[in-house]
Structures are given as structure tokens and as C-alpha cells.
């Protein structure tokens, strides 16, 4: 049975409407007056009795996290993470696991669903190589406090050299496909082991981590599957580095009968590219029909550790809360109206509605979710029990 259509106590969760804030409204039925002479006095006001009826069907709200990394992500491993996919699901279910910094962590309230979304690029390579790098031996605060300002830079160069020396090679099939496949099998096995229909749902998936031009201009998507019928290896940005190439892959997966979708995240770091539908010359950048984009990417992740992607003060000048949890700037760049337009959900939805009126189609129809992007194998959504993003930063 598809994970995208599961039975939860008689209520069907259709699609991934994960945070649909739908209230169950009680139905009321007015009953006839009670035939009781004692209630018919001159000073008595007769009020029809109201009885509540249980709501039938409808939607329920379920809580989960569709963006969690483990030591299979090379950036997580080189920052001190040693947790595995099994730890993600144990933590999400309420069990205690060990944080990368060495202390035990437990979620305050178990989740209903979760997904391990390790980076498809270099999947499992750093862990297999057992890289011993500065960022796994020393906390970032200590590195930054070092009197020698070159320490951090030297640390990063040491990481890059070790990655190169340990055979992180690019091929047309991806990065060392044998290692990739093995790591992917570990992710799938953990999802199958912890999947409890009607109790706890796991979603196999990965993160497609493409950057436009330079690192820091994010076009990242999480690819989420709703069934156990899966490809043998993740599709990474090495296999296809543009969103249209990813969409073509997703469409081919759909044609094989696999239920899959992509969730864009951190559009706030995309330099306005995340929700752009045409180039500066007006040419459409997606080669699919307008309906395909909203079908393949029905939701966007607009809140996580790297800031809010709902709106920006430059786009919503009259909204006094528009600066809530804004990430600030893309590293090394100043945020301008040009760089933020196309990078925030509220403006994108408005653009989609405008396109529907003016051009007769809307490729920007989507719902919204919040996720963590934790690289600690945890879901740090509780302020009092915040487990951070990476051990070297926590």
C-alpha cells in the first residue's frame, strides 16, 4: 500500500498534505422541545437542546519531519555526525539516541512520520573513508577563537584534500555508484524496518543538492517516495544539475508506477531562482507543461534551520512580521529586490495567481511545510530540547 494514502484509524491521509490545518467541525442537530410542564412557567425561557455529533471523515493533522541527515551525508560526517538512518527513526519514535557531541537526546513528543534525506552526492563516501578531519576533532567555537585566523581555512583545505585523496570521483553514473548503492540500501532498509502502518510512517528519500553557479545559491530539493518500489540508486545533481532535469527524472519514475515527488527547500538562498518560471529574456526555463511542475512539486519547505522562506521585508514592506527568522544574506552577497523576488513562497503564490489570470495557467500552485534540515539524525523542533544542526556547531 502506498505511504501517500495510509489508513489512520479510519481517516485516510491522501497525498502529502502534511500540515493541513483543518479543524474538525462538530455537527449540531436541533432537537424538539422537551414535553415537561414544569418548564412552561411564565418566567421560563425554553431553549432547544443542542447535542453535538461526532465529525465524520475529514482530515487530521499529523506531525513529522521530511528533512533529516545522517552520517551518510558527507558534510554531516565531516562535522562529527556518526548517527545512522536507524537512529533517525528511533529518535522520531521517542527513543533516546546519542548526539554527535556525545550526550543523550530524546524528543519531547514522538512524531507521526519522518524521512531520511541524505545528500545524494557523495552518499556514504566520507563515512566509508573514515575521514579524520579537524572539524570532527575540534568544535567550531574553538576554531574561531584560535588566535590564528587561518586555522578555519586550513581546516577546510585539509578536508578537501582528504576527500580528494580518498577517491571521491565523479562519473557519469554518479559518485562511485557501488558506495552510493550500498548507502541507499541502508536508508531503504531502515525505512522498511521502522514502517508501522497506522502508527508511524517512514518515507524513503534523498536530497538532490544542486547549486546554480557557485555553492551557496541553492536549488536543493528533497525527493520523497510514497511506496517501497524504488530506484536502485538516487538521482543526484551529478546526474542532472538543473530542476528541469530532475523533473524529467521524476516524470519517468511516475511512468514506472512509482509514487514520488520533490520538495524545494531554502528558496530564500536561491538568489531568486527557486520559483522563477522564465529566463530574463522571457523564455520558459521548464520543458514540462505548467501542470507538471505543481504536480511534481506540490509542496515547498518554507521554514527550517537556515531561515524562513515565506516572505521578505523587501517583498512585503507593509507586513511588520516579514522579517521573522530571515536568514539575512546569501554568503558574500547583498540581498536586493532582484535577488529575493522568486525566492519566497508568498510572492511566488501571488505570481502564480497572476499568471493564471493573464496567461491561463499556473505552474506555482503548492502547499507549504516546515522541516528541520537537521544533520544530527534528530528533529530539533522543540526550543527547550533543541539538538542543533551539527555537532561542531552545538
Regions found by a protein language model. Give the residues of each.
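Generic intrinsically disordered, low-complexity segments enriched for polar/acidic and small residues
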Residues: 1, 5, 25, 59-60
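Extended, charged catalytic domains and RNA/DNA-binding interfaces, predominantly
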Residues: 10, 27-394
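N-terminal Sec-pathway targeting helices
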Residues: 2-18
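Hydrophobic alpha-helical membrane-insertion segments, chiefly the h-region
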Residues: 19-29
Amino acid at each position: 500500500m502506498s505511504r501517500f494514502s495510509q489508513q489512520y484509524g479510519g481517516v485516510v491521509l491522501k497525498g502529502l498534505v502534511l500540515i493541513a490545518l483543518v479543524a474538525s467541525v462538530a455537527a449540531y442537530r436541533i432537537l424538539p422541545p422537551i414535553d415537561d410542564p414544569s418548564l412552561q412557567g411564565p418566567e421560563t425561557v425554553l431553549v432547544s437542546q443542542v447535542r453535538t455529533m461526532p465529525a465524520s471523515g475529514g482530515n487530521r493533522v499529523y506531525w513529522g519531519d521530511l528533512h533529516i541527515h545522517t552520517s551518510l551525508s558527507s558534510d554531516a560526517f565531516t562535522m562529527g555526525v556518526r548517527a545512522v538512518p536507524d537512529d533517525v527513526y528511533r529518535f522520531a519514535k521517542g527513543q533516546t539516541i546519542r548526539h554527535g557531541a556525545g550526550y543523550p537526546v530524546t524528543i519531547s513528543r514522538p512524531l507521526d512520520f519522518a524521512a531520511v534525506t541524505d545528500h545524494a552526492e557523495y552518499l556514504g563516501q566520507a563515512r566509508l573513508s573514515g575521514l579524520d578531519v579537524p572539524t570532527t576533532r575540534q568544535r567550531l567555537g574553538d576554531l574561531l577563537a584560535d588566535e590564528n585566523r587561518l586555522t578555519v581555512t586550513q581546516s577546510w583545505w585539509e578536508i578537501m584534500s582528504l576527500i580528494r585523496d580518498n577517491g571521491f570521483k565523479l562519473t557519469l553514473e554518479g559518485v562511485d555508484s557501488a558506495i552510493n548503492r550500498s548507502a541507499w540500501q541502508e536508508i531503504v532498509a531502515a525505512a522498511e524496518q521502522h514502517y508501522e502502518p497506522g502508527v508511524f510512517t517512514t518515507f524513503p528519500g534523498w536530497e538532490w543538492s544542486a547549486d546554480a553557479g557557485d555553492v551557496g545559491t541553492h536549488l536543493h530539493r528533497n525527493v520523497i517516495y510514497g511506496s517501497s518500489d524504488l530506484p536502485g540508486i538516487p538521482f543526484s545533481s551529478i546526474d542532472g544539475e538543473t530542476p528541469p532535469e530532475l523533473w524529467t527524472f521524476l516524470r519517468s519514475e511516475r511512468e514506472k508506477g512509482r509514487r514520488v515527488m520533490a520538495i524545494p527547500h531554502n528558496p530564500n538562498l536561491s538568489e531568486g531562482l527557486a520559483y522563477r518560471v522564465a529566463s530574463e529574456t522571457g523564455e520558459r526555463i521548464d520543458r514540462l507543461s505548467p501542470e507538471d511542475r505543481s504536480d511534481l512539486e506540490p509542496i515547498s519547505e518554507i521554514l527550517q534551520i537556515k531561515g524562513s522562506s515565506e516572505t521578505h521585508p523587501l517583498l512585503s514592506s507593509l507586513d511588520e512580521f516579514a522579517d521573522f527568522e530571515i536568514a539575512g544574506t546569501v554568503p558574500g552577497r547583498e540581498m536586493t529586490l532582484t535577488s529575493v523576488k522568486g525566492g519566497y513562497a508568498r510572492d511566488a503564490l501571488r505570481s502564480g495567481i497572476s499568471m493564471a489570470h493573464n496567461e491561463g495557467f499556473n505552474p506555482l500552485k503548492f502547499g507549504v511545510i516546515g522541516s528541520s534540515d537537521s544533520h544530527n539524525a534528530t528533529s530539533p523542533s522543540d526550543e527547550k530540547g533543541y539538538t542543533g544542526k551539527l555537532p561542531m556547531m552545538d
